[in-house]
Regions:
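Single conserved hydrophobic/aromatic residue that forms the stacking wall/gate
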Residues: 1-12
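Active-site cradle of extracellular carbohydrate-active enzymes
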Residues: 5-6, 25-58, 64
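Surface-exposed amphipathic alpha-helices with a cationic face
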Residues: 32-44, 69, 97-102, 167
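Aromatic- and acid-rich polysaccharide-binding/catalytic face
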Residues: 50-52, 61-129, 134-137
């Protein structure tokens, strides 16, 4: 869940920064290597994925993984986050994936991806006041930069193109993706954090859902065509 993930990220930042913040790669490697060794101690056969955000930023990936591979334990998978409203074009994602697939010889997984299907407000579904709501993550100024319209068809077309792109990464290194978050529709009580999480992070609540227009179900819970696309997808030759 997003609340758990965000809480974990904040704990990591609080405890590892500034010692573990870029460009302190010696320290970063020590922290990450300790985590890898912990995984190996439990099960030496578990694949390890190192996951960065901003999947269209090749310079970021080259710098981080160049520095880590000089110092790091072995890992099997590079994970990327890619949201078209934050991380550039599909061309940028594809170019980055092809480059790092060859450069590091690792399998790749897009560990986070989504595309909106509407800009219809969902305030009435959440039943929260304006002060309590988070609102959209996809602000209008971000939507205007996307190559695809934020419509049901736009979501479908984006995901079809995305799936074909990651299916043709050099060396067959593109191994899959995780859609974030397909079933997070705007019903009352479906905010991103529990009361305990909000208290821990000193954040106001209940905050609501800022991601509902990215789901694979509409606001009433009806499945969207993109769900069937993903289920039945076969890459273009």
């Amino acid at each position: 869940h997003k609340a758990i993930r965000r809480q974990r990220q904040m704990c990591i930042r609080d405890r590892l920064w500034p010692e573990g913040k870029v460009p302190n790669y010696d320290n970063i490697a020590k922290f990450v290597n300790a985590g890898i060794r912990g995984v190996r101690a439990v099960d030496k056969d578990v694949p390890v994925m190192l996951h960065l955000d901003n999947g269209g930023n090749n310079a970021l990936y080259r710098e981080w993984f160049d520095e880590f591979t000089k110092r790091g334990e072995d890992f099997q998978i590079i994970g990327l986050s890619y949201y078209p409203f934050w991380h550039g074009t599909l061309d940028m994602l594809t170019d980055n994936m092809n480059d790092i697939a060859e450069r590091y010889g690792k399998d790749l997984i897009v560990a986070e991806v989504s595309m909106g299907y509407t800009m219809e407000d969902y305030k009435d579904y959440e039943k929260l006041s304006d002060e309590e709501r988070k609102g959209y993550a996809t602000k209008q100024e971000l939507v205007e930069k996307i190559e695809y319209p934020m419509t049901v068809q736009g979501q479908y077309d984006f995901m079809e193109d995305f799936l074909n792109r990651i299916s043709h990464i050099k060396g067959n290194r593109g191994k899959g993706f995780f859609y974030w978050e397909p079933a997070w529709i705007p019903v009352p009580g479906s905010g991103w954090a529990t009361e305990a999480s909000l208290k821990y992070m000193n954040d106001k609540g209940p905050c609501g859902n800022e991601w509902a227009n990215q789901a694979l179900f509409d606001y009433q819970g009806n499945v969207l065509p993109t769900w069937n696309l993903i289920r039945d997808f076969k890459p273009e030759e």
